[in-house]
A protein has these predicted regions:
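Residues forming the flavin
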Residues: 1-279
Length: 279
């Protein structure tokens, strides 16, 4: 295990070790790690290969905003490991590679990039006509990243709720928390959605001073304490909004924690008004 640095904003509990498998080897991480951070700390730098040219891909956004670290986790393809919390006994597999991300047999496609510009399949392989059905099968095989096993059976506890509220705040950073507090203090019912497992936004990890010697992360903690003390606010952390519709209808999916009775929960929220505070 490499690269662990103790900081006031660290959310990894180094006293609780977890193990998982990758490339038929056992790796270790800690509670609070994501799958990607545990792999990186274990020395893994290459997580996948790009769709078309099979170019190497590694950590980029560190917040689940890219597909570089999409992997197969416990038989489920295209799992974004940058935002998937590590659990004991996970089985992680690379996808879109022939071999491994480090030694991909299809890596030679990168040297053929000039022969495969954008949309090349619309202009080539159509003459003679009998060639296209054969080429189409190969293009289909090359498309996509993960593969769904026909033998896979989904397991777990799934839930759905349909709450209504006066104000729906999307984003649990400093602006979102401040907006939720301001609305709740007037007596309005508030629902707060945050995609990360915790609140704070970009204040959460900043140790520089906010004002009067108070660091940003401490300011975020103070805002969260005020927010959670108010009875009219419902907080849905680890809940990514996936749809916004007319009449202030919002849908989201929430990932359950170890103390929740569900693994994944579908949220369908009706709101009178909305505050978008996504940064």
């Amino acid at each position: 295990m490499k690269g662990r640095k103790d900081t006031p904003t660290l959310r990894v509990n180094t006293n609780e070790a977890l193990t998982f498998t990758y490339k038929k080897k056992t790796f270790s991480g800690f509670k609070g790690d994501t799958v990607a951070s545990a792999l990186f700390a274990g020395g893994i730098r290459m997580f996948s290969r790009s769709l078309k040219y099979h170019r190497p891909r590694g950590l980029y956004s560190l917040d689940g905003e890219c597909s570089n670290t999409c992997m197969d986790v416990n038989g489920i393809p295209n799992v974004n490991t940058e935002k998937t919390l590590l659990q004991n006994g996970m089985h992680v597999t690379a996808q879109n590679v022939k071999g491994s991300p480090e030694l991909d047999a299809l890596g030679f496609l990168d040297s053929l990039d000039r022969l495969m510009p954008a949309g090349f399949y619309y202009r080539t392989m159509h003459k003679p006509a009998r060639v296209w059905p054969i080429a189409l099968q190969q293009v289909r095989k090359a498309a996509g990243l993960g593969k769904i096993s026909p033998d896979f059976r989904m397991s777990g506890n799934f839930d759905e709720i349909f709450p209504s509220t006066d104000v729906c705040v999307i984003g649990g950073g400093p602006s979102g928390m401040a907006a939720a507090v301001a609305a709740a203090e007037t007596g309005l019912r508030v629902i707060l959605l945050e995609a990360r497992p915790w609140l704070g936004g970009f204040f959460d990890y900043r140790q520089s001073n906010f004002s009067q010697g108070v660091p940003h992360y401490q300011r975020a903690q103070e805002l969260e304490a005020r927010l959670r003390a108010l009875p009219y606010i419902r907080v849905f952390a680890h809940s990514a909004m996936v749809g916004a519709y007319s009449n202030n209808l919002f849908t989201a999916f929430q990932i359950g924690g170890e103390n929740d009775p569900f693994d994944v929960r579908y949220l369908e929220i009706r709101a009178q008004s909305t505050v978008v505070a996504t940064g």
